[in-house]
Amino acid sequence: MYKKMSLRQLFSDRPPLNAVLQEKAQKLRYACSPSKCIHSLLSFLPIITWLPKYDWSHSFFGDLSGGLTMAVFSVPQGIALASITGVPPVYGLYTAIFPSFLYIFFGTSKHNALGGFAVLSLMTHGAIEKVMLRTATSYNATAYVNHTLDELLDKENETALISNTTLMQILGNETSFVEEVTMEMWTEGVTPVKQIHVATTIIFLAGVIQVFMGVFRLQYLTSLFSEQVMSGFVVGGGIHVFFAQIGNMLGIELPRRSGPGYLYYRIWDLVENLDNVHIPTVCISLSSFLFLVFGKEYLAPWLNSAFNYPVPFELVLVVVGITATNYAELSLRHDVKVVGNIPTEFPPPSLPRFDLIRHIGLNAAAIAITAVAIHITVAKVVEKRYKYKINHGQELYALGFVGVLSSFFPVFPVTSGFARSVVGAAVGGSTQLTCLFSSLALLSVILCIGPALEYLPQCILSAMIIFAQKGMLEKFGELKSLWPVFKIDFTIWLMSFFLTVCYDMGEGLLMAIGFAVLTTIIRTQRPKWHFLSRDDDTENYKETKKRDLERIQGNVCIFRMDAPLIFTSSDRFTMSVWQCVKKWERCKSESFVTIEQMNSDRSADIFDSKLKSARRRWKRDQKSENRCKLVIDCDGFPYVDYLGLSTLKSVYVDLQAAGIQCFFVVQKSDLKKLFRATDFYEVVDESKVFNKVGDAVKAAEQHISSPKTTKEILTALASIATTDTVLIDEESSDSNDNDDAEIQERITEESENSEEVMSETSVSIEDATSLTSSRNSINSEE
């Protein structure tokens, strides 16, 4: 494919190897200098750049107000997200403190605030359940390794190691089984794996993955998370969150479920336990939900405009719930479940459980990529709203460093949330110091008023979580705008939603991305092509609709396909070229006056059909001289691969064999180098490759041959028409109506490509008739 001489010519303008090596060594020496290394390390800490320029007089009080407001909203939200993750409530507050504080040093966004996210918490919960069950099963199996299966399951033996009850717990109720094994491990002096251990290991591994994404500049991978994929995924995640919290709202204790399709089992467990609904819990949940609906939907717009300050209805609900539960003793008298003990001390740092990495690798990768996609999406919205630039590459490092450093404290995976990011800005927050004040306020909440949160009912948290999913469910409105115009995007949205709901969060997201990529591949296999024509006003060549082809002067067809010419689209390109030629010639033929329009006498229809058939046959014999000239504009190809280049050569050869002169327009330097480095010019005449479309059109017009004389055309038509007269007369005696229809269809098809001849030579019906009559008389005399 590549020729030795062509490669030499291609790289002949490059400097000698020694000069290149010396230049590289000099650049490496400069990059490894102490000053450059220090500058590179400091580039990972944007705070060094913006903090000395901080405007204390104009920004301090706004950031302080924004931080306190953010802390007020983060208290109930953090506790609620901890319940989704399946860890103690205080860890939700820790998650709102440490990542947000660390992001100040590494982030480039002034408004992004890191914290828990419902979808990530649910994905983390699934990984925790998987690891806890695996660990419990593995430990439990070691106690029975020396026993046979019959001994373990002996129904008649009262000392059987595994009873039917225990077996049912393993198969149907993971909750009791995991808890019993955990208690047994504590009894025997073995430190069991806690849920927070799994969560911290996940955020550590996810942070490492995000750092590597930053090193290799893989932020472009977030482009795979199209808006439709993320919308369907987030809405599907909202469905998972709803069924994860509905049990707490109803006061039903449901068994743990995890793995693909666990949502079906969760729904079945919910239906089976409807008889166990706790009425006091339902009343508290319903009243809490109605309070949020009334306050957030009806009172909030009026109060926000009146006080110019967002009212924290969630915090008001938490205070009311704690007060009512404490003084009415709801947990003691009516068995209403509450949050429980919250430590009032600063957690000591500890290492993650590295031995769990082999169990959570895939989960951590899915969580890492999802967190990056959500964070970059929020960053883009913030960029657009507040009109400043965010370094997306540095944001990958920021997420990674925050994850790795936060894993030394009891936290779970985090990302940005749009509501959390703008709530501080709504009251004046304008820099990253907003997160600093928020973290300090949350820390004071834990150390000072943490014990008061012990009386918060869990059903109130569940009501807050389910109400928060309302915004996600509003994304169903996107389908209405997608369906009329963007049907493929509509399908991607629905597939992402159904895969997330029906399968699982992590696996469903990966399959949704795969489906979106598949639709992209299919669309590259069916690229759009169009004709080009000259604009008389600008003298440039523009896209022309197929119905406007008859307005184009001349017989030079300009073809352009706007898509990569690669292995997925090469067959489509070949088909499109021939389709272009066919439509061009048919349109040019139909644009001239037909014989039916020249002679409307119905008595001459049979002769007209014979004459059109004769013209069609003559045109077919002469087509190698009068077919259109094709110009292929290669600037529509972003890039061309090996098969695409072979397709170009094959199309050129086939067009030449069919009598169609083919010309190419190439302006891109990369494509020119590709042509010269390969054997392209051994197949294609280099004189037929041009830099501009206008030059190619002029060259094509010079190749058009002069038409036949009128006498030659009429003589040929009359000769062929005489033969057709005899053949059609013989066939008509034995044909039925269907045969006549077939002949008429064939005649019509032939006339479509032959009427150009009559227009070019101004042939009339009378001339052809007289010539044919004289020809018949000569034949009769013979």
Curated annotation (Swiss-Prot):
This protein's record includes keyword tRNA-binding: no
Region feature Disordered, mapped onto this chain: 728-782
TM regions (residue ranges): 30-52, 64-84, 86-106, 113-133, 196-216, 232-252, 274-294, 302-322, 359-379, 398-418, 433-453, 497-517
Polar residues composition-biased segments: 767-782
SUPFAM superfamilies from the UniProt entry: SpoIIaa-like
Gene Ontology terms describing biological process: chloride transmembrane transport; sulfate transmembrane transport
Residue span, STAS domain: 546-700
Membrane topology field: Multi-pass membrane protein
Sequence ranges of Acidic residues compositional bias: 728-742
Cellular component GO terms held in the UniProt record: plasma membrane
Pfam families: STAS, Sulfate_transp
GO MF annotation terms: bicarbonate transmembrane transporter activity; chloride transmembrane transporter activity; oxalate transmembrane transporter activity; secondary active sulfate transmembrane transporter activity; sulfate transmembrane transporter activity
Record-stated family: Belongs to the SLC26A/SulP transporter (TC 2.A.53) family.
Function: Possible sulfate transporter.
Protein known as: Sulfate permease family protein 3
Organism: Caenorhabditis elegans
